[in-house]
Amino acid sequence: MFLNVLLLFLMGCQSAGTRSDPIPWANGIEILRSQSQVRVPAIALLRSGWLEQAVCTPETRTHESVFAILAAPSELHAALLVVGGVPGAPGAPASLDSPARPPEGSLLHITMDLDGSVHRLQDLIVDDRSGDSLQGNFVFAGSKMVEWNGAIRYLADDEGSAVGLVTFGDELVGYSEPRSASIEHARAIFRPNGLLLPPPGTEVVLIFTVCPEDEG
């Protein structure tokens, strides 16, 4: 899997030198290098209930996410590299022997585009503690490479963790506030904003923009 990501990255760099924006990518992804932007086709999921993910992949965490992207997280990872994103590391919730650790990596501005109507991802999710939209940020954490049955795998591809809210430690993109995924340690606080989200099954485009360092 690491080799696949590297090949996609190198192909993207080569394409960027010879082609103008947008650059077609795997599974409908489009890259706009001039805008440090990656556009990914997605399907709307929940408009009610509780969330642990913001964005997953089909047939993974669709019961706890507002969108499913129609591409592998490793493909999005490679595309973010092409537009200048720098992966860091997923966060970790607090434990008995260590404090919480927020995710690290390039700051990302994520929006949903539905036929020209654009909303920030933070505004599509409600923090139940305040009743308002999310106040934190999303960062390019980069998930993890793990060995399984003798093969190296990209963990977010297996788990479907494209954009996390609670902290599983496998997220491609993490939310800036580390929070335990266990309800025994932290109550559920994230829920969909049904006033802004489209009906389940609606086709949308998610836009990932790498922010300049001085915005971090």
Positions of predicted regions on the chain:
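Long, low-hydrophobicity ectodomains and other hydrophilic envelope-associated domains
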Residues: 19-216
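Sec-dependent signal peptide recognition
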Residues: 1-8
